[in-house]
Amino acid sequence: MTPFNNEKYIRIQSEHIKERIAQFGNKLYLELGGKLFDDYHASRVLPGFQPDSKLTMLTQLRDTMEIVIVISAADIEKNKVRQDLGITYDVDVLRLREEFMNRGFLVNSVVITHYSGQASAQNYSQRLERLGIKTYFHYTIEGYPHNVALIDSADGFGKNDYIETTRPLVVVTAPGPGSGKMAVCLSQLYNEHQRGNQAGYAKFETFPVWNLPLKHPVNKAYEAATADLNDVNMIDPYHLEAYGKTAVSYNRDSEIFPVLDALFTGIYGHNPYKSPTDMGVNMVGFCIEDDAACQEASKQEIIRRYYHALNDFANGDISEAVVNRIGRLFQQVGISTADRKTTTAANERKERNSAMAVAAIELHDGTIITAESSPLLGSSAALLLNATKYLAGIDHDVKLIPQEMIEPIQHTKISYLRGRNPRLHTDEVLVALSVLSLHDENCRKTLEALPELAGCQVHSTVMLSEVDRKIFRKLGIELTCDPVRK
């Protein structure tokens, strides 16, 4: 049994969405918060939740739904990158569309939001049109979301393109937060109403989990994940007032609810929801079967997020306030960086050997393996060799890649490719192992052990190169680094 019951989730979540569609006369715009697939955050804090669980769940509704993908013109303009995949949002829109269509979902359109005539957005729209993808523009509305009189008018939502949809359920998704998904849904409600069509709105967000305690580590891990957005979990005051029951929401939903109340009243003549919690359809909290395991997984996620923030701050990508925001969560859930075993192991070896670059990995059986840089190998490359040798049952002292093979590679890197670091990176070590595996049984065994590294934890005492980061990401390894440059 896993801590999270994924089968139960898929069943009861799809049933609940069907009920909400029926509530609004068989037309529902469902704003999807977070990721529809590749939801690795959810799979880390809720062990047993699969990265594509939400997509699998929606497969139950596939014949009655279509997907609209949203991207902000501002994100196109600044080439915003999805950090977990290392690709820009505009590229991810095409990836998402292809993934959805490969799974049999209908994807008819892309909406470019926050549009105010940006040339980059126009060029992107033309590119999509050449690919046969219908594109719509939704414009920047002055005073949004608080200028309700303007928003709920022909000069507000009324000037947005009306998205042609054909199915009862319209799922509105995006590559990342801040894309304008809610505004797209509300704009559609306004324009459907103008055309005499009945339609409803609901919000499908996994986090925060409304029926877990406010300070539950699962909910605190969500705060860590959205620290750059300044999201803060809070008790839903509207739900408490309406029902006398506590439910967890977050600041942005509570802040915007009076605006939504006015918009819904303008569109419907009344607000069908009494609270932000009412708008949601999330059933995740009913599917947790081992709360202690989910709490521990969430605490580890907060530590990882803290290290990621330290690295981003060192690179100048975020403010120190974001780092401090995550740091304050440590006291709230009772953790420290020492609770990450690989961090302790790597730093202990660093101090013991007076080494600069040390890396440590925790394998699934609890074994901790460490490695440090040498004249031949970087610490990450050495760690990969040590870990796969252990998993393959090969003695630690066995040399898999002979020095006479490494040295010519180093010579090429420095003399011909104008590199400054002669040490082999993880990708170069894997290529060398692949070549040697044709005639060396041990090399073949180490390569075959690579899939066993998925989900393992690694910590480095220095910030790694992008090459090594990508290899760890592709192997499914959870990496953290001290904010120290080599």
Predicted regions: what they are:
Residues 176-177:
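The conserved Walker
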Residues 372-373:
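Short clusters of small/polar residues that mark proteolytic maturation junctions
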Residues 399-419:
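Active-site pocket-lining segment
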Residues 1-172, 188-349, 353-356, 363-365, ...:
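Flexible phosphate-sensing "switch/lid" loops adjacent to ATP/NTP-binding sites
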Residues 395:
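Long C-terminal interaction/binding lobes of large macromolecular proteins
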Residues 184:
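Hydrophobic positions on the alpha1 helix immediately C-terminal to the Walker A/P-loop
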Residues 376-392:
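A short, polar/charged loop-to-alpha-helix boundary motif
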